[in-house]
Swiss-Prot record:
Subcellular localization(s) per the UniProt record: Cell inner membrane
Statement: the UniProt record of this protein carries the keyword Translocase: yes
Primary role: Produces ATP from ADP in the presence of a proton gradient across the membrane. The alpha chain is a regulatory subunit.
Binding site for ATP: 169-176
Protein name: ATP synthase subunit alpha
Phylogenetic placement of the source organism: Bacteria, Pseudomonadati, Pseudomonadota, Gammaproteobacteria, Enterobacterales
EC nos: 7.1.2.2
Family: Belongs to the ATPase alpha/beta chains family.
PROSITE patterns reported in the protein's UniProt record: ATPASE_ALPHA_BETA
Site label Required for activity, positions: 373
Organism: Salmonella paratyphi C (strain RKS4594)
PANTHER family assigned to the protein according to its UniProt record, in alphabetical order: ATP SYNTHASE SUBUNIT ALPHA, MITOCHONDRIAL
CDD domains: ATP-synt_F1_alpha_C, ATP-synt_F1_alpha_N, F1-ATPase_alpha_CD
One GO cellular component term noted in the UniProt record for this chain: plasma membrane
Amino acid sequence: MQLNSTEISELIKQRIAQFNVVSEAHNEGTIVSVSDGVIRIHGLADCMQGEMISLPGNRYAIALNLERDSVGAVVMGPYADLAEGMKVKCTGRILEVPVGRGLLGRVVNTLGAPIDGKGPVDNDGFSAVEAIAPGVIDRQSVDQPVQTGYKAVDSMIPIGRGQRELIIGDRQTGKTALAIDAIINQRDSGIKCIYVAIGQKASTISNVVRKLEEHGALANTIVVVATASESAALQYLAPYAGCAMGEYFRDRGEDALIIYDDLSKQAVAYRQISLLLRRPPGREAFPGDVFYLHSRLLERAARVNADYVEAFTKGEVKGRTGSLTALPIIETQAGDVSAFVPTNVISITDGQIFLESNLFNAGIRPAVNPGISVSRVGGAAQTKIMKKLSGGIRTALAQYRELAAFSQFASDLDDATRKQLDHGQKVTELLKQKQYAPMSVAQQSLVLFAAERGYLADVELAKIGSFEAALLAYVDRDHAPLMQEINQSGGYNDEIEGKLKGILDSFKATQSW
């Protein structure tokens, strides 16, 4: 059989038309060492900092060290079966987590995968865990309050929307309790909450989730979990993942509150990763960039202006500002606030709530030390009534603490000093509050009004608690409209002052406690 040149060219054309080739450029490398969740890879020439590297078994690692002839990466997840010689690939993507309203009411891990047994998460898309914080021009000053429901905090150390307020103290001083109560108090405020648990026991987190559910706050909250048994990489990344979920609400003109519990454990996880990557250690064996670790996270908590929100949503949301308020928690050792990580975070944040173990052990809970606790920007966000009534409280407590120290050495005290000591003791007693019992602005205002106007003068110290409980029950029963008005407006004028005075006069005349 003889083919002529025309037939041959036709056959070749047909074969060329049928030929289908899909070329994929894979940047592939080989694992050369595996140690404690850190792998060293040879051959990834075009790898980026922070890039996800695909490992065998549908797992990923993140590239953190880019060296001349190798890449150091941390494995996200189990690593026991990884071995030298295994092939890995670059993905060309950085780590992203699911974001959106579908995450509210769910418990997820660092990567956004559900761990609460309630099925898949309904998300609105993905966001990169690392993001640049809004610039100065995109921000707006803090002038709206976040009510924690604690008299001691809302009166003396007020927190505003978009603020970063550090909660610092030794272990077992009520840091998590304060943060959880702040979340519970946002049930009806419209503020979405994110609770990031880093390096805690799974049983502790389970209790927190159960309490949030009991008090009707879980539906408004995303819980991000990296337990103590998980890899250091997941503990290090958990706060950034939670922050990305919070930014979803901030950038769409809504308000969000995020709790990092706690950043001390994140710093320890990062130290572990850095030492395994053979980065040079510095003070307390932390790497040189441990300040940047926290500053780039906490700077993302901000109040953004309406122009930023409008530009981000492409005009869908107009005239609304957004905010992400951060309450990072730091655990100190024996009250040492001058250690490396505590001083770093104190310098980054807009104030701190210092909880003292000796106050906690003395039964003063929340164990807030008003002397060294401060809110640098929250004063502008305080409601008018709280600002008016709380000024005298801080002064009374400061004078009381000074006189209490002095009175230990003086046997005979004049009447004025005795009155100040008595008033200070009663204010201290009044600021005590049970856990899971946050108070509204109106309730706090009434109690502070009673303290400031001398209505506690003839009340025995032991009966302050029952006096407060009876007073709140009385106003809820007989003066609910006024309480509602104060909660809605937060205003203070002669009329409201007169009504509060009338309530306290009639209560003391007709009620018992």
